[in-house]
């Protein structure tokens, strides 16, 4: 689900590195790379996306970390940049997700004041321990958000500095109380989490004089299933007093508390801060069991039986980020360009989350405990989003992570009985529609990430493409398959029973388009594995977008005709109650309109162009969709004026929506019809929406999807056609980008004079010194590394590079007889 910032911009945040230092780093980049990695973790601005509805979190996490420590405010995703108070620091977050009921478990806040009968925290009144009530104001002055490190000044309770850092499975928090505090308390609230994230039950135990541990059961993600989080916190010194609270209030000296649904529950720990003002806690969580949390803490938060110090934890976390970020090196651009780029790279590397504990155990979709021996099990898969860009970024740059992701999805299929769509913790939520797991896994196959498991993957994908999960399964799968397999379309039926918030027949028009795209991707895998009959069937089904294309539908304002339209179960076109179907309406399309979904047939460009009455008319339709003339006249500002800008503006629209996934590939439709200079214009305009500010992301970041889109847009490559292995070439934003491919090879993309503040067009391309006429490169060539040089021009070469039909990639599922002319 998508959200879009409603504010155009705010004052950019303080640079993580001084501007002069950034310039020096650029000037001496080769020297720095040879001597020691640049401190790229400080180039990251974790506040990007934390305002409006970007839904990112500013706190600390490791790459693909199991645990995150970040502030909790008033928003369901955790905290917004303009929230007035911090309720606590939670230990589980997603970056950029759009559903409520997510994260914030184990809300911890340092406070001062008296705890007891009639005290500041009145043990006779359970409401005193509501984190909405005891939340602290804070200041953005001095606030730091870097990769692996977060710091904020709480201005309540006499002033307290709160810091956080995180490794993969353990984290550290350091609280520095005011000089006159005398006694500082740490509240560990397990009865509350992020706003709208209901705690169903909780247990907390105070162990000895340094430890608190327990578990809490929460609902998940748009009304999903319940799941359990186990946790453990160990402090660097003993607390002098403690107690617990529950529904009846607080009890000093109590060590145990167990409470039910939405009941107050937690513990307080009191420290002598007269001589030592700092309190450090090392924390760990697990989705397996209590021993999993303990072992995670021992493995990554201790050394030689002793807790690691905060600075040790921070150093290890930020060194890991430095290594990860240094795998992609940019030259050129402004300091803000660099921060936006490395912040996007950071956000693209946060998910999926590590699901296996330090001992390899993880909780599977059968709710049993399994072990990942020699590999990492991942969880939290927003596939409807990530199949479009983030999956390909990981496969291109981190093949080992991609292999483990593929293996995790196959484990889910084996243990849960079906492949996931939106997998949260250890169960399927059935959020969103279509068939995202197919293009996701086919791309992993194409990139070699399923090597040795191709047969297992194909068997699972084929079953998903032709069948349905049983009624007693949590998985909805392709719920429109019965009609789709027989008739070629998903019937539009708003009364169709759902296993979750979403189900395909509720959005029959867009589901048909998604199924057809997935079928074409799977046809290529079937062809590659020698399943000729399946390949033929699936290839034909890749053209099923025709089944929901009504040539008679006319857009009244533009006069253009021919658009997708949902069909009913009897095969007739859907007609709304007023008797007039508009391609700008919401009927039958998930978070979009027919105008926006018409481009989701990139597997069959010749057929789509034919349906739009030829290349010239298809180009004019794209021009209207993007407001192309306005973009040329005002490339730095037109996108905010002409395109969809509302956070919930899915419907009654006909313009490009840069804030939602169905349109992510649409700028490259120009390239696929032989007008690559227009792709350059649109991409440059869209890049202006990504800024070094809290609202500097388009819509929800959706577990790194929008960030990955930006990365590809900035380096000059984009994977527009799922399953094809084709990367389309376009104008880079930087003069040079070096991308390590995780195999010892490096891909260098260079564009002399590239400037993100102006319109520039590709005049020609050279690959390893040789002229390259096609507008694309395939995966087999990219994985070899090498160098791609772009020659840029200020004037659009309307008859030059990439405009000839023979320079365009072949559509695997092209309509028979349809050709580009």
Question: What residue spans do the PLM features occupy?
Answer:
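Accessory carbohydrate-recognition regions in carbohydrate-active enzymes
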Residues: 34-391, 395-439, 445-513, 524-547, ...
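Bacterial N-terminal signal peptides
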Residues: 19-30
């Amino acid at each position: 689900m998508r959200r879009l910032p409603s504010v155009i911009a705010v004052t950019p945040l303080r640079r993580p590195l001084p501007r002069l230092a950034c310039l020096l780093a650029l000037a001496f980049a080769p020297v720095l790379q040879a001597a020691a990695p640049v401190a790229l973790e400080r180039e990251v601005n974790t506040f990007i996306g934390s305002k409006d509805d970007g839904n990112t979190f500013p706190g600390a996490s490791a790459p693909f970390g199991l645990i995150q420590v970040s502030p909790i405010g008033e928003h369901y995703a955790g905290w917004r940049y303009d929230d007035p108070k911090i309720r606590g620091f939670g230990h589980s977050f997603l970056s950029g997700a759009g559903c409520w009921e997510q994260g914030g478990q184990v809300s911890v806040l340092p406070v001062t004041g008296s705890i007891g009968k009639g005290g500041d925290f009145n043990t006779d009144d359970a409401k005193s321990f509501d984190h909405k009530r005891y939340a602290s104001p804070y200041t953005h002055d001095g606030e730091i958000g870097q990769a692996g490190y977060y710091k904020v000044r709480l201005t309540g309770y006499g002033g307290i500095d709160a810091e956080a850092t995180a490794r993969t499975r353990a984290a550290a928090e350091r609280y520095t109380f005011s000089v006159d505090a005398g006694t500082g308390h740490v509240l560990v609230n397990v009865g509350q989490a992020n706003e709208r994230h209901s705690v169903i039950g909780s247990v907390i135990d105070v162990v000895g004089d340094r430890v608190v541990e327990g578990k809490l059961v929460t609902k998940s993600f748009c009304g999903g299933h319940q799941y359990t989080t186990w946790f453990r916190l160990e402090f660097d010194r003993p607390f002098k007093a403690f107690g617990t609270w529950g529904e009846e209030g607080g009890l000093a000296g109590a060590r145990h508390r167990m409470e039910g649904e939405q009941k107050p529950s937690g513990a307080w720990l009191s420290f002598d801060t007269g001589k030592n003002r700092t309190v450090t806690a090392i924390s760990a969580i697990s989705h397996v069991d209590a021993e999993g949390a303990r072992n995670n803490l021992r493995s990554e938060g201790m050394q030689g039986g002793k807790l690691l110090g905060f600075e040790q934890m921070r150093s290890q976390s930020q060194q890991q980020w430095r290594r990860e970020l240094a795998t992609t090196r940019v030259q050129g651009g402004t300091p803000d360009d660099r921060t936006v780029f490395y912040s996007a790279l950071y956000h693209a590397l946060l998910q999926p989350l590590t699901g296996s504990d330090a001992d390899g155990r993880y909780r599977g979709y059968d709710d049993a405990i399994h072990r990942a021996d020699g590999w990492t099990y991942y969880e939290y898969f927003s596939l409807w989003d990530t199949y479009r860009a983030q999956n390909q970024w990981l496969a291109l740059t981190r093949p080992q992570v991609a292999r483990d992701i593929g293996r995790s999805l196959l484990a889910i299929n084996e243990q849960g009985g079906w492949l996931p769509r939106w997998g949260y913790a250890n169960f399927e939520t059935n959020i969103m529609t279509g068939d995202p797991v197919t293009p996701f896994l086919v791309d992993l196959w194409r990139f070699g990430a399923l090597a040795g498991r191709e047969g297992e993957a194909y068997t699972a994908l084929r079953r998903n493409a032709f069948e349905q999960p049983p009624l007693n399964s949590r998985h909805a799968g392709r719920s429109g398959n019965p009609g789709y397999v027989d008739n070629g379309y998903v019937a539009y039926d708003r009364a169709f029973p759902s296993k979750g918030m979403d189900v395909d027949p509720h959005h029959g028009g867009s589901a048909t388009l998604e199924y057809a795209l997935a079928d074409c991707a799977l046809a290529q895998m079937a062809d590659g594995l020698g399943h000729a009959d399946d390949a033929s069937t699936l290839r034909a089904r890749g053209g099923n977008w025709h089944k929901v294309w009504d040539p008679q539908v006319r857009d009244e304002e533009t006069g253009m005709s021919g658009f997708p339209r949902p069909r009913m179960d009897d095969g007739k076109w859907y007609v709304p109650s007023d008797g007039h179907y508009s391609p700008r309406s919401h009927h039958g399309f998930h978070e979009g309109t027919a105008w926006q979904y018409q481009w989701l047939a990139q597997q069959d460009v010749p057929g789509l162009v034919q349906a739009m009455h030829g290349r010239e008319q298809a180009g004019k339709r794209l021009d209207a969709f993007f407001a192309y003339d306005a973009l040329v006249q005002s490339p730095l500002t037109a996108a905010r004026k002409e395109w969809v800008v509302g956070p919930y503006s899915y419907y009654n629209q006909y313009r490009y929506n840069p804030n939602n996934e169905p349109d992510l590939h649409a700028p490259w439709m120009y390239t696929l019809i032989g007008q690559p200079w227009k792709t350059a214009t649109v991409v440059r305009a869209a890049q202006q929406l990504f800024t070094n500010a809290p609202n500097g992301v388009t819509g929800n970041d959706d577990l790194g999807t929008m960030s990955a889109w930006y990365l590809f847009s900035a380096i000059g490559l984009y994977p527009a056609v799922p399953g094809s292995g084709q990367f389309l070439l376009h104008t880079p934003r930087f003069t040079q980008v070096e991308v390590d491919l995780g195999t010892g090879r490096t891909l260098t993309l260079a564009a002399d004079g590239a400037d993100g503040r102006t319109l520039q067009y590709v005049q020609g391309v050279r690959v390893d010194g040789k002229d390259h006429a096609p507008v694309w490169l395939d995966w087999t060539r990219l994985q070899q590394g090498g160098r791609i040089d772009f020659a840029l021009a200020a004037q659009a070469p309307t008859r030059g590079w990439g405009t000839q039909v023979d320079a365009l990639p072949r559509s695997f599922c092209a309509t028979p007889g349809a050709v580009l002319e």
